[in-house]
Every structure is written in structure tokens, then in C-alpha cells.
Amino acid sequence: MVKEKKKADKKGDKSARSPSSPSDYPEFAKQDGNAPRQDASPSAAPALDVQPKDPGVKREVKSESLPNEDTTQYEEPVLTKLIVESYEGEKVRGLYEGEGFAIFQGGCTYQGMFSEGLMHGQGTYIWADGLKYEGDFVKNIPMNHGIFTWPDGSTYEGEVVGGMRHGFGMFKCSTQPVSYIGHWCHGKRHGKGSIYYNQEGTSWYEGDWIHNIRKGWGIRCYKSGNIYEGQWENNVRHGEGRMRWLTTNEEYTGQWKHGVQNGLGTHTWFLKRIPYSQYPLRNEYVGEFVNGYRHGHGKFYYASGAMYEGEWVSNKKHGMGRLTFKNGRVYDGPFSKDHMVAFPNLEGEVMSYPDSTSECAFGCQWCRPSASAEIMRKLDGNESNSLLGSSLELDLSLLLKMYPERDQSEEKKQVEYAILRNITELRRIYNFYSSLGCDRSLDNTFLMTKLHFWRFLKDCKFHHHNITLADMDRVLGANNDIPVEEIHSPFTTLLLRTFLNYLLQLAYHIHHKEYQDRSPSLFLCFKKLMNENIRPNACRVKGRLFCEAQRTLYSMTYVDKCWEIYTAHCRPNAAPPHELTMSTRHFLWMLRSFKIINKELTATKFVEVIAEDNPSMYDGIDSNFELELVFLEFFEALLSFALICVPEPPTKFCSDFPNDDLSVNKAGSTYPVTAQNTQNRSPSAVASQESDIQFSSTKSSSSKLGVLVDISKIRKSEPKIKKSVSDGTTSKVNFKSAGKGLTFLLSQSAHKHEETLKEKVKENRLHNEAMALQRKMENEELEARLNSLREEEAKRQDYEVDITVIKEPVDAPSSSFTPSPPKEDTVVSSKSITSKKKKK
């Protein structure tokens, strides 16, 4: 054991602060001043801001005390005597070397490896206040990987840079049931990470952090089971997000500000069902929010089927509004504090009273309880004459106008009887198609969308009656006053009564000429459609989209992006109402512009795919390229083209694409980032690339859809893409989780992607040209060096021959050369010649 005494050295720099003095190791804070305000008590996550400071001797201080490099005599550094009270271990040339134990002034200790007088390698450093670090040291500084242990028992294990938590690591607090695992930057939570606020793991946050603050995108699960998924700012919900209150069966999706609903959003109240029953709707509000209240303009859909659209003030209907009752009657007028101000006009349906003036009559009607009750019964539909009941009352006014007035009553009665006889089967069909592509529903009810309705029409072969789906949309749009921009929208929802109304309208449009001379005509039209189309074919799903449950769920993640592509390439229809539609010709041009039409997918194959389920496309002789395609036909055609263009599983593209969803923090650690549609993305948007690749290999056409748009360019530039990955360049490809699977989805609109890809190809071409020029220069330089070596070798051999001829060597060892580089041989031979000349 070697003990060093304290000495005052005049040569030491008095102004230099001792690098290992207690002031270099301040006490570590135990409380988190930025504890979440809403998620836990102020002491719930305090210890996560513990920031270990630099504990070791600085390298630059050591260099000041080292002697001159040219001095061969090593002297013990002066500062060591002042800093280290005692040392046990080995020394080399006066410097600590190997394993040792040192006690510093102030009570700090170190046991571990030394190198050239510095703590270097594995070791354990304990501060005077009890904080301990076990791990790697690099020149007196904790680096790479280590474990911090605080006096209260809290621990951190993970990456360390400059004595601070930096990189990936896990922190556990001993005083509170709080733990964090994720990325750190300069001692603070920064990047992707998960924090758990209780021992059971039922209260947690997983997502983005910026300097100990939840900021970005993340998921917060509360102890009650309520879940928020969306954007954060300054530790509160802020931006776009979805909140689900499982305790009260509510859900809100929309904009947030400072932790409360603010802006546009949708709030849904899910009703508890009576056993063996279903509600067709849940209560839902779609509109503006201010500080958590319904405030501004909005729509409220009641579970009964009624709807209010108008102004709101602090959760109450206030101002001008339009209230549609469940039987279809409408009140349009002012509201005050959730009540109608003016009395609704029932157009003569209200009983008249003997008062001469309408004003007096109105006042009597408003005041008399019996009249008011009767009016409300009429408004609520309790006195409906429909055989189907008020909840399924059909709107037949437009169809009945096609018949003489004397026949209208009989036509209505007979068609209602027909619906009533088939209502069980029609309800089953509605429920079946409305649930396609839906993963879950809190109240086990589903709403049919236009996308489902199109699939129903195609399965039942409505389009085989010389009418396309686009034509059907126009017929229904004209009959029901649908806005032009929503005529072909796949997201429009249909209630059961709307579904029944549409069937009757299409039945009349398709068969009315056949039964125009027979009565009841409307009943016969519906009966034929039911017997020949609906009953034999319904619920037998065809097409690429809804034929497999797993494929459907996977493909539905592309609907929004493909809808953008579809609308971008639509053109106004020549005939009224001049809505945007896509013809088969424009579809083919779009594919050609994306370089998808190739040897695998020819124009002939394109026609065959479109004509598979569309008799209007090809009659055996001619092809109809003016055929209009609705979005369902467009989307299913893309899925079919994906099978043709990408026959093999696209897993090989995974390694070729740079992952844009990986962000690098200051420490160089990589973590996934998810930006997402809060409605369509799974709560756990962070998944490993390896598991995603394995999952994607099980997909068929849906997993190939994302690379379809630029598949031909990918195949041509695959080596270039690999090179760009090695150079750190990135392409616009998102890896997002959908059912825990890997999805290739272009982050740009498809009509813009070609320009981006052209720029990327141009950049790769310039890069390859530069690399080729560099390789050429390297080859020329290498060739010149080889020629020089050959010349030296030839000269050396000639020189050896000359030496041998002039004089034989005195002894054998001098004439035998061991294999070594040519230059060394020349030097050895020249030295031997010189020595021989001196002997002479």
C-alpha cells in the first residue's frame, strides 16, 4: 500500500479548482419540479429529474500537470497529492495503473481500474453524500454504460455520456412506485419513453418527451382505465387526440387545448344495451368546443334518430337551429337555453280552435296541456300511420308522385307490407355489411357506409341491369337532395331506414318500365329485386377488399390515402350535376404516369381485372374506357394490381427502405416516432421492425398496395436506394403499425410522389457519377503505385546481380536475405556493402 501525504506545492496553479473537490459533485436533486399536474400527485414522479453531474477528474486538468512529453523521467502529478488522500494499488512511473482504490478529499471514493493516473475502465465511484456509480469510466468521466444508485434507493441503469444519463436507460424510484424506461438527453427524459406511475402498471404514459416534458405524440392510460391517444404540449393534452372514458362509455376525438376539448371535435355517448337488443345509433355531437363545452355550431345525433343542427352555448341549444324529429318532421327556428322559442308549424295537422286570430289560436295551443301533448305526439311520431312503426317510417313521397293520386295509398300500403315481410332478413343484411372492415364497437352496433353499400350492390348484381354504381349514386343523389361533393363519397353513413329507402328507389328505377301497366307497381318492382338479386346473393362477399377479415382490416388503413389519390385524378362529369368522377381511361393514364403499367401489368391485363366484376367494361369485342368507377371499384382494382405487380412477399423491400419514422436524439440513440391519424391507428404505434417484417409476410394483396405506386421505379433503382441508405439519405416512406403489422404507405400524395421520386433518382445518379469518378481516380493512383513498385523491384534485382558479380560475400548470413519488403532489402544490402568497403 502506498500512502500519499498532502503537500503544498508552489508550482501548482493556485487558481485552478480541484477537479475532484466536493464542489465538483453537488448533491443530486431528489424531486422533479416538472411533475405532471394531471396524471399524478406532485410527488408521483419526482425522482425522474435526478441528474448526476460529472464526478471524475477532468482530462484537461490532468494534462496541465503532466511533465513535458520529451522528458524521459516521469514525475508524479502535483494535483494528485492535493486531491487524493490515500491510494492502494499499483503505480507505473509515478502514475496510478491497473486496479486500485483511492480516497479523495471530501470523502469520495473510487475502486476500479486506472490508466496513466486516470480512472479508466470498469469502476465504482461513491460520492460523499452516498450517490454511487458503477460502470465504465473514460479518462475520469463516467461514459458508455453504468448504474447510478441514489441514497434513497432509486436506481438508473443504461447509457451514460459525460457523467449524465444520455441515451437509452431505465430509472426506478424507490420512494414512489414510479419507473421510466426510454431515451434520455443530458440527464432529462427526451425522445421516446414509457413511464409507469403505479406498481400495478395500470397508470402509464408512452410516447414523446422533450426535456422532461410530455410533448409530441403519446398514449396516456389512467388508473381508472380511461385512455388518451394523441398530441401533447407542456404535459397536457394539446392538439389532435382521442380520449376514451371507459368508466362512462364516452369518447371524444378532435382538437384539444391546455388539457380540455377546444376546437372541432366529435363526442360520442355509448348507450348501455338491453340484453338481446341493439340501438341503431349512439348519442353523438359533431361540432365546435370551447373549454370543454359544446359551444358554437354543431350537430347532435340522438340515439332515437332525431338530430339537431345549429348554435350551442355552454352545452345548451341556444340561437338559430334546426331540429329534425325521428319521424322526419322538422322545426327550424330560434332556441333559448335548450328550448324552442317559437312554436313549430305543423302545416294544418294541429287542431284548430275557434279563436278568430292566428295569434290567439297560437297562444291557446301553446298554453293548453292537451293540445301541447297532442302536438308532441305528432312531433315524436307516436301517431305515425306507417305499418313499420315510427323508427322505420319510409320516405315514399317522391316515389308515390310517380303514380296517380288514387293509387298512392294502395301503393304505399303494399310496399310497406313487402318491407315488413322481409324486415328480419333486410336487418340481418344491413348488420352484416355494416360490420365489414370494423374491428370493434363498444355497443356492438355498426353504421353502414357508402363503401359497404357499394359492396352490397355489387354482390347482389344491381349493376348487371345496365346501370353502373356511379349512375345509382346520381339517382339516389337526385332523389334525396345529397350535396354534389358527397354523391360519391365512401364515408357517407346510412341508417337502416335510409338503406330501405335506397332499395325501393333503385327497385323502381330498374324495373318500373316492366311493371308500369300493373298494380301495385312499386310492390312488384321491389319483390322482383328481392327475389332475383338480394335473396340469392346477399352476404356472399366478393371482391378483394372485404373477402377476408384480416386483409380487410389491413387494407382499410390505406383508405384515406387512396381516397386522396382518387379525388386528385377525378374530373368533372360532362352531364349534370357535374360531380367529380373517374373514368376507366383516366385510371389507366394514372397507372401509366406512375410507371405501373409494365410487363407484369399490361393494358390487356388491366381491362381483364376491371371486367372481372363489371359487365359494362368488356362485351367480348370492344372495351368501354368511358366506364365510370366509384371509389370501391378503384380501391379493389388497386388491390388486384398489387397481386400482379408484387407476386412475392415484399419483405425484401424492408431492408432497402430507410425508416423515416426513426429519429435520432443528441446521443445518437434511435427511436420510432409515430404521427398518426388518431382514429385509424392502433394505440400501440411503436413496434419493432423485425416483428413488423415477419407480420407483413403473411399478407397478400393488402400488404403490397403501398409499394404499388412506385414499384417499377423501386425495381430499377434498388441498388441506388441501398446506397442512399448507407449514406444516411431518407425517402418518404412511413412504417406505421396497423394491427401490429408493417405498412408501406407513401407519406406524400400519389400525384406528387412521381416528382419526388424523379428528384431522388437524379440525386442518386449524380451520387453514382461522383463515386465512379472517385473510383477511377483511386484505380489510377493504385496503378501508378504498382508500376512504381515494379520498377523498384526490377532495380533491386539488377543491383543484387551487380553486387554478386563484384565480390562474393564473406559469410553466408550476409548473402541470404529473409523475406521482407523490397525497401528494407535494399537498405540491408547497402549496409553490408558499406561495411565490406570499410574492411578493405
Curated annotation (Swiss-Prot):
One Pfam match: MORN
SMART domains found in the cross-reference section: MORN (SM00698)
Name of this protein: Radial spoke head 10 homolog B
Assembly with partners or alone: Interacts with RSPH6A. Does not appear to be part of the axonemal radial spoke complexes 1 or 2.
Swiss-Prot/TrEMBL MORN repeat ranges: 86-108, 109-131, 132-154, 155-177, 179-201, 204-226, 227-249, 251-273, 284-306, 307-329
Stretches with biased composition (Basic and acidic residues): 1-16, 51-63
GO cellular component: 9+2 motile cilium; cilium; cytoplasm; cytoskeleton; sperm flagellum
InterPro entries: MORN
UniProt keyword annotation of Cytoplasm present: yes
UniProt-listed SUPFAM superfamilies: Histone H3 K4-specific methyltransferase SET7/9 N-terminal domain
Function per UniProt: May function as part of the axonemal radial spoke complex 3 (RS3). Radial spoke complexes are important for ciliary motility.
The entry's keywords: Cell projection, Cilium, Coiled coil, Cytoplasm, Cytoskeleton, Flagellum, Repeat
Region (Disordered): 1-74, 810-840
Highest taxon above the source species: Eukaryota
Residue ranges of coiled coil: 758-801
Subcellular localization(s) per the UniProt record: Cytoplasm, Cytoskeleton, Cilium axoneme; Cell projection, Cilium; Cell projection, Cilium, Flagellum
